[in-house]
Amino acid sequence: MTKIEKTVNLMKEENTYRRYEDGDSKYSDFSKQIFNEDKSHKCPTYIHKTPPCQGSCPSGEDIRGWLQIVRGIEKAPEGMSMSEYAFRRSTSANPFPSQMGRVCPAPCQSGCNRNEVDDYVGINAVEQFIGDKAFKEKYKFDAAPELNKERVAIIGGGPAGLSAAYQLRKMGYASTIFEEREKLGGMMRYGIPNYRTPRDILDAEINRILELGDIEVVLNKRVGKDIPMEEVENSHDAVLWTIGCWNGKSLPIEGSDAPNCLSGVAFLEAFCQGRLKVGSKKVVCVGGGDTSIDVVSVARRLGHISNLNPQESPEAVVHGYVAQDVSESAIKEGANVTLTSLFQKEEMTAAEQEVNDAVHEGVTIINGVLPIKVEKDESGRAVALIIAECKFEDNKPIAIEGTEQRLEADLIVSAIGQSPDIEGLESLGNDKGFFDVDDFYRHKTKEGHFVAGDIIRPHLLTTAIGQGSIASQSIKSFFDNKDFKRRPKVDVHHFNLLDKLRETDLEPETYTAPIENPDKQRGTDTSGAVIHNYEDRSAQEIIPSTELFLGHFKHEERVKRGEAVPTGDEVIDHYEDRIIGLSEEDAIKEASRCMSCGMCFECDNCVIYCPQDAVFRVKKDVATMGRYVDTDYDKCIGCHICADVCPTGYIKMGLGE
């Protein structure tokens, strides 16, 4: 039986409930039309597009790339392990895989096309595996190139500044990081609790960047106060501002000026610095985002101590910049912690898992309420927060009369947003204190100055990392005196087939036109000087689920990470890492759920179903990622079956148009 006959038999239908007028009890056999009459001038070509996970990633990681490495489809160079190769692919965009694998809210997973089949791919979980494996194996970055003559001043040692220093050094530029705090890390260190971003791993990921060399660090110095801006300008060839937003917004209601009304930013910084070791008995936090969840989770862990010295109260610690001197023998009791949010639970901006963990730890969450007033006692201290149910009119919350509630509080924390602190740098800010930039992250009014991170607009850590990377590229263009070209529509890191061919010693030859018998070479399919039958649209197009053959993918449960979330009775002083990372076996299993949107993942469908035997596997000694199959155009009739059964949308009909 021929291959066509086998395929025809597979497509023939069994008896149906309906009998046609001629008495035939079977559907008509369309195989002849499909295999012999559905011809066209169009032939398959291989189109590389960006998957939506990468298009949704603010730091611009080649997510599909390192997932394919972990699952074993894209092979590591000889002598390099899978985990190290995945680490190098991941950190080409983001030098903090372990941190982002833990705390990033993962917009990539929301955009994952696998959501149309069963559930998103656990991208964060696999990224954490990559980062933690790199930490255990002590992977280092490749040696940096020789230095260029220019040097960059980076003001701020948080995720944006560190990302920029890393990318600049890979391009041959030295930098000086000016950080006003005692350690690098920014919000990763001073805004997120240690049980979410383990400090030993954070230190390792920062030191890995500094070990590239020629990245000078100046700590405990604030530019604009301790160091004049002019001095920095005169000693550097460009300046990058990555100073973040360190002022928390206070509640815009009566009584919020009470001394025991704090911002979430200040509360978390005092805790992360180790100065705040015990909290208050009754804590109320207003928010709904990730910062507010960190506040209430920390408050539950701190607990409270009866008869605490007023000079060591949380507000005294925050306002006075002193540390609590709490005896280890002091008996801590549980704190009554409440979080209020304008929005219903499903509308809160905090990560769903973080919200659920907070509830598991004993936090009470009241949704759909608006803070009305802070009630004070005779001394001026806050004793309660008055809230009311609310509704939205013209996108503004309006309190509903008669629904007021009184929440007793010893400490009220506002986690409703952040604003810049630009004391000494007022000339650089707009009327709200933020720095205005153009599309290339150049400061709009200051030549040679660039900006990245929250000082533009408060957003995610991954956003700051991505902006730092793009700003570093703009700085290079500035040094090269080149025109600033328009950024790609899909502005992320992409798989590059030419680079892959070079890596495997398969780089195309130099083209030489045939002198004799020029007709002998009819097209590029027989030329070793070009990548035949391939088009890279990754910088312009994101492939939607509608371009995939979703029927290929069977239902597979997501491999979830374990958690060590304490109960309300266990939460006091519980500072262990809550997330239990995937084993290598589970990481491979979860990475294998990736549908490889926009790139061949070697399923063989096109080879199996081609009725003309026109599609064939490329010989192993010249095959690589993206060049697994090819087409014999002497056999191809343009029937489009290969494109129809391609699960990843990599094959398109159109060559010859």
What is each stretch, according to the model?
Residues 146-147, 151-153, 203-254, 373-386, ...:
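Feature captures the FAD/FMN-dependent oxidoreductase FAD-binding
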Residues 29, 61-78, 116, 120-124, ...:
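Beta1-alpha1 glycine-rich phosphate/pyrophosphate-binding loop at the start
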Residues 1-151, 199, 241-257, 377-380, ...:
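Ferredoxin-type iron-sulfur electron-transfer modules and their immediate structural context
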Residues 159-164, 285, 291-295, 323-326, ...:
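Extended, hydrophobic alpha-helical segments in both membrane/secreted and soluble proteins
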Residues 147-160, 279-289:
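Beta1/beta-strand and adjacent pyrophosphate-binding region of the FAD-binding site
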Residues 259-283, 289, 301-304, 374, ...:
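FAD-site-proximal beta/loop scaffold in flavoenzymes
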Residues 222-226, 267-270, 345, 372:
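Short acidic loop-to-helix transition motifs that present clustered carboxylates
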